[in-house]
Amino acid sequence: MNYFLSRVSILLLFAPIVLAAQQSDSVFMTGGKQVSLTPVVIRSGTNVPGFIKRVENDTTFYKAFKNLRVLKYTSLNDVRMFGKNGRVEASMNSKTRQWASHSCRVTNILEEHTTGDYYKDDGEFNYYTGELYASLFFSKDTVCGETNVLKDIKLSIQGKRGLDKHKEQLKMLFFNPGKDIPGIPLMGNKVMVFDPSHSDLYNFVIDIQEYKGRPCYLFSLKAKDDLSFFKKDDIVIDEMVTWFDYTTFEVLARNYKMSYNAGVYRFNVSMEVEIAKFGKYLYPKVIRYDGNWGVMLKGKERGLFTATIYDLAD
């Protein structure tokens, strides 16, 4: 009965949505941030400062990716690399199964098909995007000591150098956006979108919508269009849209765009992530990546990949 009443209350909150659309948003100032609230949010009585703090401190999105370290699952993998003419010049399609037990995991390739020069003659990756993808989702050899416990990023990159360090930094940037990433040249705190020094760079919006039939908060931030050249240089996360479960505040999905150019290190990336739940574990059900990036002496490459994860077991 309590669940029914709770559900009715949420539906009543959504009921006047047509009328709400005809009303203008209101602006709320908190922590130096200018946040636009839709009429439905105003009616809900949402504690805006508390909401922003929960968004800033959220760990459910990153936790979903960490949970892949301790779960068994099957993955459909689609990676495509594009040439300067915009055509696919190399690709990899595969089906893999990760086995995980007692803090150890290993990936078995069930099926794989490649085209073009996806691999070098010696079997190594010819593209950094392919190598990055493999480091995210594959473990060719058995790896032990795995955990889904969140830890300091400084510890996760400790002792890593070169491309291994860059891969770890990119993983943190992709899977924990908005938090400081140490060691990326000249980036500093530019990714810290909630830092007071970045408050005037973004438009923040809070809304209440449905995501695949579930009531949720929709939180979006987007770099302002009228920024000066030097202000634009302080932007790394261009746009981020996140759907939070209305009751649990767990992330249901996130879309984001990021770009950066420091000469030696540059990227322009869009990502879409759908989060699902297996028992007590959140996990990324679908991950879509489309972007180009490069590191000095490695050249520039554009790739697209999609990972679809299913058939989980603990």
At which residue positions do the language-model features occur?
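Gly/Pro-enriched, hydrophobic low-complexity segments
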Residues: 190-195, 212-314
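Generic marker of "main functional regions" within proteins
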Residues: 11-15, 46-52, 61-65, 137-138, ...
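Bacterial Sec-dependent N-terminal signal peptides
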Residues: 1-28, 37
